[in-house]
UniProtKB/Swiss-Prot annotation:
PANTHER family: EXOSOME COMPLEX COMPONENT, EXOSOME COMPLEX COMPONENT RRP46. The keyword Cytoplasm applies. InterPro entries: ExoRNase_PH_dom1, ExoRNase_PH_dom2, ExoRNase_PH_dom2_sf, PNPase/RNase_PH_dom_sf, Ribosomal_Su5_D2-typ_SF, RNase_PH. Keywords: Apoptosis, Cytoplasm, DNA-binding, Exosome, Nucleus, rRNA processing. The gene is crn-5. This is Exosome complex component RRP46 homolog. Homodimer. Component of the RNA exosome complex. Interacts with crn-4; interaction promotes the DNase activity of crn-4. Interacts with crn-3, cps-6 and cyn-13.
């Protein structure tokens, strides 16, 4: 097992026309995330029981239909937010990939969480993303683009903070062959990294609240 999380940076309320937004980076990988809502939804898409989610990931270039990541973020938000509090409404979350030097999926998930925190959404639990790759039987956390390209397997964990404060798997997407022992090892590596990301959330939000109170 090798590596550690690259340096994280975040600027909240980055986009002035959004209800919540963030410019978030890990190393040289950077995204812009924004959210709008809860707001009105077209009658054909409205639910009597819960808020609907509109999730969109857009790469800086190439195909913008990043369906796997959209599904992971959608599944994660369904667990992290009590959607039943806002029936007949919708919330839109958009993530733009600005620069990709690896771990884009994890960075996109983290940026989406920051945008929702900036919006003041009531969470059941916060969430984050952690990417692990396998290179020559070695597991590497938060890989660069070069390390991803050399990998024989990738697993993206969407992690929620459990009621006991410990990380729990919320969603997962794996590429390549992974046996149970390898997945268990990857999850063991991801857990302390998820805790470090949650601590970073707390630091950033404390800074935001202290500024807002001035």
């Amino acid at each position: 097992m090798a590596g550690r999380l690259r340096e994280m940076r975040c600027e909240l309320s980055f986009l002035k026309n959004a209800d919540g937004s963030a410019c978030f980076s890990q190393g040289a990988t950077c995204i812009w995330a924004s959210c709008s809502g809860p707001g009105d939804v077209h009658a054909s898409k409205a639910s009597d029981e819960a808020m609907t989610l509109d999730i969109s990931y857009r790469a800086n270039c190439g195909d913008n239909k990043f369906n796997v990541l959209n599904n992971i973020i959608h599944s994660t938000l369904s667990n992290a937010i009590n959607l039943e509090l806002f029936p007949h409404t919708t919330i839109s979350v958009t993530v733009h990939g600005i620069q990709d030097d690896g771990s884009m999926g994890a960075v996109a998930i983290n940026g989406a969480c920051f945008a929702l925190l900036d919006n003041g959404m009531p969470f059941e639990t916060v969430f984050c993303g952690v990417l692990i790759v396998r290179v020559k039987d070695e597991l590497i956390i938060d890989p660069t683009a070069k390390q991803e390209a050399a990998s024989t397997g990738r697993v993206l964990f969407s992690v929620c903070k459990g009621s006991d404060g410990h990380p729990e798997v919320c969603a997962m997407d794996a590429i390549g062959h992974w046996d149970f022992i390898q997945l268990e090892a990857a999850w063991s590596l991801a857990q302390p990294s998820a805790s470090a990301i949650f601590d970073f959330y707390k630091t950033v939000m404390k800074r935001k609240l202290s500024v807002d109170e001035q």
